[in-house]
């Protein structure tokens, strides 16, 4: 077991290295000139050259790559071209709303997904099952940006239950800041719930077919105990896997909902950075997302191996 | 043959429904020029933002173009992009997956790279690539294929590995059959199922992601109709012309829904074991 | 006798009490006006807040509350001394002597004097592109005494004072505290000490700018009229929120989250009219949509080809496609609108707004156009640019001209347009409100970024332009203006398609708001 953990941790290194390479080259291969955007249309060639030099953008690509790599190992992600602050600082500031949205979406998704999945499995082939299948299918089929706009239209513009956009940080508004995050989280939760419901349902269906369940039934155990105590626990493994693997997708989803609801999180920051070629921020955002995904996956795999000693990485 | 036999054996509400919807969509997109007289890109700005009427079933957009027409052609675009992405993903993913599964030396290197690629949500890779290569249908197809093929490669690789050491393959090898023959005869046949299932889900994903990319402005170039771009355009007019945003959104949902249904149905049909084998940690999006 | 006295006394008393009550009421209303935090929604965010170091007009618009100029424009575009008390122009325009107001307080408590103005001016001259227009003609600035300054020119430059107050982009000259100018030099300023009715509080990039009332503000004694005259800070605090999405800006005002939103979709005008809580603010057509040619690349290095496109387009249809509701746009051929002293009534006659595809094709033949696709380069983020490009492509293709449409995000557009090849047509919104034709945003001379224009015709234009610069006599200058307009419509290095209005909206409880070319929030209060 310990060897497995060590092996996986060691594997992180080459993966993150490759991720860094990909992040750097993707960013710096994008056409578009941030310097001219900063200086405006009337900038002269000499002004452009001057700014390029002070930003270090006139160096050859390979050199910039190694300099950047050396810096990030030290934890220095450079300074944003537009936000006038070190990237690591900006990333840290924007982390909270994104995490809140992601966690809220995940929690909402898990609770409703589990519920829906269990209901479906227990009522296999009956109306409730069909209903749950259909609902979860819709969940994974609706484009998140469209859903966000629909929700905004109905609940914010027409009903006025939630603010349309923007964000007040926790420090200022306390729990009031959650008002701004509910619709974005719900948008993302739809898809999570759909995925989790589907996985739960199929895992439960398989488990419920097993012999030991039949034994428990014949023993006369109540349905509730069978479902929750035995079946659910043993179905959790694939569900947890699905949750873990979809966390990356969830993070990707925050980019879109943050943009639509104007929440100053890491996703909005990343999209803005791409739109105006804020190179240090783009690089950092890409690495950030990838690293989180890799770490979460590691977690999932480890807990997986932990919970099911039968499966091991070859 | 086995496929059809299995099909007739059980009831398949999912597959049937989804195939019906998909045939309908295919019909709409193929016969778009016949079904509507209007040109999807010709402007008629003096007639902008008209509500649905007899002349314009779904009204007109901000350029006076007939929305119904654009929806039909937009479906066609989504289908084209989805199909192209699926084909490319299957080819690339298949080749890489088979190579990795069959030749263990390759496997180590390839898997590391694939793992790293899969560390990014597909949409982010696609956005970045689209930003680099520029917008446009071809670039979107390439960008999405690039984002999806690692997953496909992985699936193929798993299938290959599970087959590779089976008895009948070993005996084929012992008898001196060439690698390529083995690959084609046994491996492809057995990985066909997971490939088909994943391909269907990729089709759905491609439609969603193309819409998202067009929404963000890095997708299909105007004036070509794209359902996602139509949603973007409609945002500004949402309150005065809600039909502009409802129609394309519903279309996207319909297309994606039916494809997901099909994928589910196929998976149930082809290999019930695939559903949630602990080894196969499949991701539906 | 006593009875009369009594009655008179009572009447007087009543009158006194009445007028006291009235005054108290008025005073109380004035008092009542004070207070509140204004939330305004703007569409773009800024990279920093230093107007000398950027061409972003939003920086100036916001910082107009923090900084003031020596001169400002009023609502009739009359140049008005603001931080200046008075001025004199001598020696045929070679010397300007400016007297400053003497008791104007800076945000740091000190009194503004010539040192502050001179330091700010030198910086403006060096960095700001308005200053760079002036610099080639300028000699030096001298301090006469603590409140008097002399500006000396090597060559007469008629637009000088107009540029100082310019409402275009970032061009305006503002007075900053000397200590800040010394501290930052040419680097981006992030500590702000000005003389304006509001002072800088906080800036969160991509989110908001917060300003709070400057309690010791010293207003001008002239009558308030847009940027000139007395500014009263009723609001305690002003928060500029950066909200790129138009619908979100709109929804914010509908729900009361914002009191003001700029640039909202004009198509929603009827909705706002119907809403009791929202007022429409239509800014009169102060924007032009310019069609800009790449004059260095075939086919548009030939003036016949350039003229051809003007004939090939149905301008009215473009109006509907680009802007929409006709109450928000109008066709206008001159660079200056009717009512502006520089308006030339018959500019572009015979070509502007004339839809003649046949003639267009003839002209293209005459120019030797080989049929290669024409590349239209435009930005995605601006509605006019985007919809205009799509509409123009459609119109040109309908008459058989091949067009390649390139819509990109702003950084890519900026990069591609700065090159001499690869694009043919570009659309850009220009500001129409220009008090002086020679600080016209589009007219900073030929061979600049907008035109890539370098030919016999461009040199002729340069000459006309130089003549105008030297001519101090208004009437003679206007004649030169007429020549310039007719030359512009003959060689057409670029042309304006139409003028359009922007629509802002505000909550009904925001009172006394005046819609000008840049939104400002002094003299306006919340009920």
What are these regions (language model features)?
Chain C
Residues 296, 300-340, 387-388, 488-496:
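Periplasmic-binding protein-like
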Residues 88, 99, 133-179, 186, ...:
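Surface-exposed binding/hinge segments that line
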Residues 353, 399, 404-413, 421, ...:
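Extracytoplasmic/peripheral linker and loop segments enriched in polar/acidic and small residues
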Residues 198, 327-366, 380-385:
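Structural transition elements
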Residues 219-271, 282, 402:
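Ligand-site clamp/hinge motif
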Residues 40, 246, 328, 361-432, ...:
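Ligand/substrate-recognition segments at binding pockets and active sites
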Residues 78, 167-239, 247-248, 357-358, ...:
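Gly/Pro-rich hinge or "lid" segments in bacterial periplasmic/extracellular proteins
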Residues 41-91, 119-122, 193:
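N-terminal lobe/hinge region of extracytoplasmic solute-binding protein
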């Amino acid at each position: 077991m310990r060897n497995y953990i060590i092996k996986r941790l060691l594997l992180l290194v080459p993966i993150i290295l490759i991720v860094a390479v990909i992040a750097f080259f993707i960013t710096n291969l994008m056409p578009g000139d941030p310097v001219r955007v900063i200086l405006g249309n009337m900038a002269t060639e000499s002004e452009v050259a001057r700014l390029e030099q002070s930003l270090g953008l006139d160096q050859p690509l390979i050199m910039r790559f190694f300099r950047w790599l050396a810096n990030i190992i030290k934890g220095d992600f450079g300074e944003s071209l537009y936000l006038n602050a070190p990237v690591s600082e900006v990333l840290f500031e924007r982390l909270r709303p994104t995490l809140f949205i992601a966690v809220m979406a995940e929690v909402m998704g898990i609770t409703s997904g589990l519920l829906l999945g269990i209901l479906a499995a227990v009522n296999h082939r009956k109306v409730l099952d069909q209903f749950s299948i259909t609902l979860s299918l819709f969940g994974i089929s609706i484009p998140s940006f469209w859903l966000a706009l629909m929700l905004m239209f109905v609940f914010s513009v027409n009903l006025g239950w939630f603010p349309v956009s923007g964000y007040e940080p926790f420090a200022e508004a306390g729990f009031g800041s959650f008002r701004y995050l509910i619709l974005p989280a719900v948008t993302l939760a739809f898809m999570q719930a759909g995925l989790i419901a589907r996985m739960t349902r199929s895992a439960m269906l398989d488990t419920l077919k097993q012999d030991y369940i039949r034994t428990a039934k014949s023993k006369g155990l109540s349905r509730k105990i069978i479902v929750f105590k035995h079946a659910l626990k043993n179905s959790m493994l694939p569900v947890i896997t699905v949750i873990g693997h979809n966390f990356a997708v969830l993070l990707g989803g925050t980019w879109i909902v943050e943009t639509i609801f104007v929440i100053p999180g890491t996703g909005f920051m990343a999209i803005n950075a791409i739109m105006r070629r804020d190179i240090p921020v783009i690089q950092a955002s890409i690495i950030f997302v990838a690293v989180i995904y890799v770490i979460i996956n590691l977690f999932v795999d480890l807990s997986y191996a932990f919970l099911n000693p039968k499966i091991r990485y070859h | 043959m086995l496929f059809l036999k299995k099909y007739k054996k059980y009831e398949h509400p999912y597959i049937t429904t989804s195939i019906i919807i998909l045939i309908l969509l295919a019909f709409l997109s193929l016969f778009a020029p016949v079904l509507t007289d209007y040109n999807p890109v010709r402007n008629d700005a003096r007639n902008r933002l008209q509500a649905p009427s007899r002349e314009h079933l779904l009204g007109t957009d901000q350029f006076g173009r007939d929305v119904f027409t654009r929806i039909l052609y937009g479906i066609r675009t989504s289908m084209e992009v989805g199909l192209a992405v699926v084909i490319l993903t299957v080819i690339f993913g298949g080749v890489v997956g088979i190579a990795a599964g069959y030749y263990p030396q390759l496997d180590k290197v390839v898997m590391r790279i694939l793992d790293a690629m899969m560390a990014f949500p597909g949409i982010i890779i696609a956005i970045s690539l689209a930003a680099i290569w520029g917008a446009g249908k071809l670039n979107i197809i390439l960008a999405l294929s690039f984002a999806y093929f690692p997953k496909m490669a992985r699936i193929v690789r798993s299938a290959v590995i599970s087959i590779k050491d089976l008895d009948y393959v070993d005996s084929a090898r012992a008898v001196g059959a060439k690698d390529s023959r083995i690959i084609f005869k046994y491996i492809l046949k057995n990985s066909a199922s997971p490939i088909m299932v994943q391909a269907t889900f990729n089709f759905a994903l491609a439609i969603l992601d193309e819409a998202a990319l067009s929404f963000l402005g890095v997708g299909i170039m105007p004036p070509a109709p794209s359902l996602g771009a139509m949603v973007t355009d409609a945002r500004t007019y949402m309150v005065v012309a809600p039909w502009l945003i409802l129609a394309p959104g519903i279309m996207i949902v319909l297309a994606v829904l039916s494809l997901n249904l099909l994928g589910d149905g196929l998976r149930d049909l082809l290999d019930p074991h695939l559903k949630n084998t602990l080894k196969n940690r499949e991701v539906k999006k | 006798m006593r009875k009369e006295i009594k009655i008179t006394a009572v009447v007087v008393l009543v009158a006194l009490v009445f007028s006291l009550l009235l005054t108290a009421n008025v005073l109380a209303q004035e008092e009542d006006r004070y207070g509140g935090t204004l939330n305004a929604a703007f569409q773009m965010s800024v990279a920093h807040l230093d107007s000398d170091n950027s061409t972003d007009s939003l920086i100036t618009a916001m910082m107009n509350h923090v900084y003031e100029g020596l001169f400002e424009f009023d609502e009739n575009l009359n140049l008005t001394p603001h931080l200046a008390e008075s001025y004199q122009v001598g020696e045929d325009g070679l010397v300007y002597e400016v007297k400053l107001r003497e008791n104007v307080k800076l945000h740091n408590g000190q009194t503004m004097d010539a040192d502050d103005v001179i330091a700010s001016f030198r910086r403006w001259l060096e960095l700001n592109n308005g200053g760079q227009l002036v610099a080639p003609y300028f000699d030096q600035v001298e301090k006469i005494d603590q409140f008097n300054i002399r500006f000396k020119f090597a060559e007469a430059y008629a637009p000088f004072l107009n540029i100082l107050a310019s409402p275009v982009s970032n061009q305006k000259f503002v007075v900053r505290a000397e200590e800040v100018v010394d501290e930052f030099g040419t680097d981006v300023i992030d500590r702000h000490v000005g003389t304006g009715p509001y002072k800088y509080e906080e800036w969160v990039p991509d989110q908001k700018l917060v300003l709070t009332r400057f309690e010791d503000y010293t207003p001008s004694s002239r009558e308030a009229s847009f940027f000139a005259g007395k500014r009263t800070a009723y609001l305690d605090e002003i928060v500029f929120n950066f909200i790129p999405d138009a619908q979100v800006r709109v929804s914010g005002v509908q729900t009361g989250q914002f009191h003001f939103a700029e640039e909202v979709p004009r198509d929603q005008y009827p909705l706002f009219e119907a809403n009791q809580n929202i007022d429409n603010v239509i800014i009169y057509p102060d924007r032009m949509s310019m069609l800009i040619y790449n004059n260095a690349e075939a086919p548009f290095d030939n003036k016949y080809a350039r003229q051809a496109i003007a004939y090939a387009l149905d301008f009215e249809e473009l109006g509907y496609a680009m802007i929409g509701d006709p109450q928000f746009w109008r066709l206008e051929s001159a660079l200056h609108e009717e009512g502006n002293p520089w308006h030339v009534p018959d500019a572009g006659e015979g070509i502007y707004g004339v839809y003649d595809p046949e003639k267009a094709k003839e002209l293209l033949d005459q120019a030797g156009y080989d049929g290669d696709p024409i590349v239209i380069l435009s930005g995605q983020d601006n509605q006019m640019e985007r919809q205009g490009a799509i509409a123009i492509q459609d119109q040109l293709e309908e008459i058989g001209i091949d067009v390649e449409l390139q819509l990109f995000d702003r950084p890519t557009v900026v990069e591609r347009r700065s090159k001499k090849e690869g694009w043919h047509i570009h659309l850009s919104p220009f500001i129409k409100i220009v008090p002086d034709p020679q600080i016209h945003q589009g007219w900073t001379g030929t061979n600049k970024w907008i035109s890539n224009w370098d030919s016999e015709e461009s040199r002729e234009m340069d000459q006309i332009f130089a003549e105008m610069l030297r001519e101090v006599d208004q009437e003679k200058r206007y004649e030169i203006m007429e020549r310039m307009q007719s030359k512009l419509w003959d060689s057409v290095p670029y042309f304006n398609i139409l003028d359009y209005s922007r629509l802002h909206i505000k909550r009904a409880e925001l009172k006394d708001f005046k819609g000008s070319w840049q939104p400002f929030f002094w003299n306006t209060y919340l009920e």
